[in-house]
Structure formats: structure tokens, C-alpha cells
Amino acid sequence: MNKILKLTFVLFLICAIVAGVLGGVNELTKDRIYAIQNAATIAAYSAVLDAEGYDEVDFDRTAFPVVDKISEATNGAGHVVELTVSGAQGLITLAVGVDTDAKCSGISIIEHSETSGLGANAAADSEIGRNFRAQFVGEGEDIALSKSGGHIDALAGATITSNAVTGAVATAIQAVNSLG
């Protein structure tokens, strides 16, 4: 019995030390991690709508549950909508630019967990990825994949991801239109 108590105490001590070290590392790196994430978001916003700054606006969160944030460009160029939608392998977070004519001005995928070589091509900095994202520019809220009568060609082998991104763009435009 005494041996079990000693082993339990040693295990507890090891766990407490490891937890303390992990907590300390988290405390030391959290500001840097936040800065990197914030820089990536700002870069994504700038890629979809050219503006010097963005001001967050209120919107009906119950009507648009996948919309995380809507920001208005300070130069009046339009809005950037940040959304999180379900893809084939997990969540996809993207920024969608919506110009003053309620058309998509660009999309940028901020974070995803899609299959490499398939759905991940939507975010890839490759010809396939750039061509896929470029299709959305100028499209309105009636956007659809070509197999559904629209103009957007799905990524080969990644129909679920293509549907998710297309739906996100339509939702972003609808959310901006609801602002009035």
C-alpha cells in the first residue's frame, strides 16, 4: 500500500510539473500567436477587398449562424465577411469580400482541414487554387456550382469542399445585403 502511495505521489508531481511548464510556455507565447493569427486575418481581408482598414459591424447572428464577423471597409469599398462552414474533413474559415454592388470581390481561405490534394486545393497557392478562387469574383448571391446550373466549376474530387465554399460566398453576400 505504501508503495502505491509513493508511485501515485511521484506521478502527481510529474503531472504537476509538466502542467506548470505547459502553462508557462502558453503564457509566454500567447501574444505572439495572437499577433500571427491577427496578421493572417488582416492579410486575408486585404486580399479580398482593398482597404486601409475595416470596422466591425453588427448583424443578425441568428439569421446567419455561420458568419463570424462582418467588417466594413473604411474607404467605402464594401464589406468583408468572415465565415466558418463545414467542409468534407472539418471546418473551413474563410473571408469573402463583397463590393458595393453586392458582388463577390474575392475569397481567401484562412484555415481548413481539408484533404491534401483534393479539398485543400481550394486554399492552395497553386494554379488550381487561384483559378478556383478567381471564379467567385463578380458573382452575386445566386452563385452555384456548374452542375447546379451556375458558373462555378467544382474542384476535381472535392465536391463537398466546393459546395461549402460556394454556399459560404452566397451566405456572405446575403448577410451583407441584410445590413440595409
Residue ranges and their predicted role:
Residues 2-180:
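Flexible, solvent-exposed loop/hinge segments and secondary-structure transition points
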